[in-house]
From Swiss-Prot:
GO terms for cellular component: cytoplasm. Its main location: cytoplasm. This is RNA 3'-terminal phosphate cyclase. It is an enzyme of class 6 (ligase). The gene is rtcA. It comes from Escherichia coli O139:H28 (strain E24377A / ETEC).
Length: 338
């Protein structure tokens, strides 16, 4: 019998990432775990619908036995079984993030006995989670370089608080892993601005695009009007295509916050990224730790290593026989497997 790994959910940033990473790694390695103080660092601790959906999805895919899988629970015991490929559908029942549920279960399906399709309904444009376009346009091309082949499709948008969005991913088992090397970004090829609107006046998007264009030379300026029943909602994105990587940044609009202020938040974030030669942005770095660890080798450079990143590394090192090294030089941190 494999040893039970004990995790403290209050460590590091104290959020849901500890639980999601632990679920992924437990499914892959077959190691059971117990976690206490779940989301202790949040205003509303314990399992929310999004986290509970991730737990139940993981349990279904690998026939796990679970203790503590209920709303508000701050303790969970997860004993995994065998991962099975196939077609799965999960409903969050709120505007909780579809992509974070997918992020939890897809790594295990890289090792399944056949191809899979996972569809999740819930929120698609959440200020604290990567949108589907980030997964599709930024992360998945990098996963393909590692040898991981999956394809994400956004079927319907769902903004907070109504939700109702749908995201699906098709994934194939990994034949072999390659080493990812991401150093400097290189020269910028082009930058593209995009605004999504659902039940929001078009002039909001026009003002947001104008704010972006006031700071950057945009190759494309796209405004997409979605059906009213998918909102109300508004998201502003800016994609930076460079010689060695494509990065994408976004901000979700808020009630009583002007279009100019929303877009200015995005401008600030992109300028922060461009101020460093590092290829990888703060949020992408979080997503690369697990696939790189599974490959057993690789490195990337990031200007601003987040608490999320450090927490994720700590959890990965509990489950896998790998050690990460972080070396900071001239404001750029090199993250590598030692």
């Amino acid at each position: 019998m494999k040893r039970m790994i004990a995790l403290d959910g209050a460590q590091g940033e104290g959020g849901g990432q500890i639980l999601r990473s632990a679920l992924s790694l437990s499914m892959i390695t077959g190691q059971p775990f117990t976690i206490t103080s779940i989301r202790a660092g949040r205003a509303k601790p314990g399992l929310l619908r999004q986290h509970l959906t991730a737990v139940k999805a993981a349990a279904e895919i690998c026939r796990a036995t679970v203790e503590g899988a209920e709303l508000g629970s701050q303790r969970l015991v997860f004993r995994p079984g065998t991962v099975r490929g196939g077609e799965y559908r999960f409903a969050i029942g709120s505007a909780g993030s579809c992509t974070l549920v997918l992020q939890t279960v897809l790594p295990a399906l890289w090792f399944a006995d056949g191809p899979s399709r996972v569809e999740v309904s819930g929120g698609t444009d959440n200020p604290s989670a990567p949108p589907a376009d980030f997964i599709r346009r930024v992360l998945e091309p990098l996963l393909a370089k590692i040898g991981i082949h999956q394809q994400t499709t956004l079927l319907r948008h769902g903004f907070y608080p109504a939700g109702g969005g749908v995201v699906a991913t098709e994934v194939s088992p990994v034949a072999s892993f390659n080493t990812l090397q991401l150093g400097e970004r290189g020269n910028i090829v082009q930058m593209c601005g995009e605004v999504l609107l659902a039940g929001v006046p078009r002039h909001v998007a026009e003002r947001e695009i104008a704010t972006l264009a006031g700071s950057f030379s945009l190759h494309e300026q796209n405004i997409h009007n979605l059906p009213r029943d998918q909102g109300p909602g508004n998201t502003v994105s800016l994609e930076v295509e460079s010689e060695n990587i494509t990065e994408r940044f976004f901000v979700v609009g808020e009630k009583r916050v002007s279009a100019e202020v929303v877009a200015a938040q995005l401008v600030k974030e992109v300028k922060r990224y461009l101020a460093s030669p590092a290829a990888v942005g703060e949020y992408l770095a979080d997503q690369l730790v697990l696939p790189m660890a599974l490959a057993g080798a690789g490195e990337f450079k990031v200007a601003h290593p987040s608490c999320h990143l450090l927490t994720n590394i700590a959890v990965v090192e509990r489950f896998l026989p790998v050690r990460f090294g972080l070396i900071e030089t001239d404001g750029v941190t090199r993250v590598s497997i030692e």
